[in-house]
Amino acid sequence: MSSRSFGKLRINFVEGSSAFFLVTINEYLVTMHSRLWLFSSKLFWPALFIAVVVALTFLLWSGRSEKMSYCEMACTFEERLPSCLDSIREWNEGLAYFDSSVAATQDTLQSFKNLLWNFWDIEFAGAGLPSISEESVLPLRVLENKKSGCMGLSWLALMVAEARHLRLDAILLPGHVFLRYESSNEIFNLEPNRRGYSYTDDEYREKYKNGNWTGLEFQPLKTKEFVGLAAFNIGNLYLETDVPRALTWYRMAEEFFPAYPGIGVNQSIAKMRLPDSL
């Protein structure tokens, strides 16, 4: 047995295990409780739960040589075992539909689009807050509720691509992501908020020309970077209402996507909003 530390949270684990049932949190409980009591005792358990999720994510993926899994991270963000998709009926029925459609039509791209926007019938949640809520960002909730913004739909699509070895990337734009599908001889852009409509790169540049460009746009996001961006979006949901929780998500975002400038900016804002006694 060995241990790793994340701040004041120490996790003991057996080598080779996922460590989900071997978390030692006594010291962390006391520390977090004393700090969060000033806000409200009601904030303690949710904040602790999120902190453990983040620590477990670091434990599972920090320093690992293999590529991070979109599917496993979808489960981890929901405080489930990494293999949770095995028991989700709608997910498995969707993959079966995709496989049968490809076998019947030999059209992988259309089968992929039909899965997302016909079989699962995922709809755009709407502009503004509905599209950036946890219900619209976390892919397992998107699959359950059939509503999504660009992040949630893209994450779900990337999970399918991972499971079926499709060449699919998430592409960053100012405040947005879209999907890029590559076949043997063609490349297609898929707009997640418009049921896979294909804008050209030039059309995207025109649509987002007034956004905050970072230099990271139009480059395929690595899995860790996409997961970091999702953590950043979730942190933003709590920036006004639950600063400790926002900072916890920003810490994960910073770990996985350190090059994204918005993370540091919002972290600084959140830290300034903490009471002096914390």
Regions found by a protein language model. Name each.
Residues 13, 21-22, 29, 34:
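Short hydrophobic targeting helices and cationic amphipathic motifs
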Residues 4, 24-26, 277:
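Intrinsically disordered, low-complexity segments enriched in proline/serine/threonine
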Residues 1-6, 31:
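N-terminal basic, low-structured, amphipathic or hydrophobic segments
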Residues 41-278:
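A structural boundary/capping signal
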Residues 6-15, 19:
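Short Gly/Ser/Thr- and charged-rich N-terminal loops/segments
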